[in-house]
């Protein structure tokens, strides 16, 4: 990795500091502070910070604060906080709109090392505000003891349920009234929260009640009314029954894998099933490294990110505990794809869409949850419920 000793004076004393306590807010020249969540890559990023210190003389403090998003917004809004914040891309638009993030301009050769769709997640208003690290997506998790080959469509799952029901088991469960999960059906044939354009998202163009979205919602009604998915199924019911070996498939993500391994379930991950002729489409998240607009050390931040953290070697170190899952770096992902579950996670993201990273998504979540609840309970027809959701989003 490149060294900066020829350019930057070494610090007289420099140590790696990693803490879960309250973060320091003041910036210091020639010293980097990174805030990130504590659930992925914690050990690996500390190793990279150590290496950066050894090779450049620049201290890197890695902090894992509670309530990171609120604290970053407060600190950065007053010109303080970390130089680099690592978080899911969905907060990027809000922070960029508030002037809290710097645009980044990686070279074409650097960009080519990462999947194009992960760079799309790092865009706001057509400009790049972060570096993609890893990808998290829903998939169809299946119990190999109950199904040899994962079903390709919901039609196949409905047929499978007729057989499994005779044994007291189910073909599929998922938390249909939670928009993150239920939306996958509505997106299959063209539903969208806000229309994606080259310049970002057109918040006046809402597609939650278009023909494709209604088609997905009508399938959901059919699944519930035929008792393929029992009315009232939520995440805890799904997770509990799947871990007991009572369910052949569920729609969930990598966060469910550790519990399955503890339960001794022999599981696989596949593409989400088709709604008609089209795959159900997840909204995927991308863990992203962003640079604070208040940082006086943006040159150092780019050096650490591009030549250390996000190099192939750096990604391997960052992921030394295996917690990143699917990654945005093409060559390193090819290595990880020996694990078919990690490969399937990336494949689901490739057919899905990045979760829109704009503040208006709050209106989407708030409108879609009651809409899906009303569809699931039968209080409203799919068209009525989705029309109401669209009206609420426009308010």
Give the location of each predicted region:
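Long, aromatic- and glycine/proline-rich binding clefts that accommodate carbohydrate-like moieties
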Residues: 270, 319-367
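Conserved N-terminal structural module of periplasmic/extracytoplasmic solute-binding proteins
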Residues: 12, 16, 25-94, 108, ...
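Extracytoplasmic/periplasmic solute-binding protein
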Residues: 129-133, 138, 158-205, 247
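Short helix-initiation/N-cap motifs at beta->coil->alpha
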Residues: 64-72, 90, 156, 230-244
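Hinge/lid segment of periplasmic solute-binding proteins
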Residues: 89-139, 149, 154-158, 185, ...
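Conserved C-terminal helix/tail region of periplasmic/extracytoplasmic solute-binding proteins
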Residues: 31, 348-395
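Extracytoplasmic/periplasmic substrate-recognition and gating elements
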Residues: 33, 50, 55, 126, ...
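Glycine-centered hinge/linker elements that transmit conformational signals in sensory
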Residues: 161, 202-232
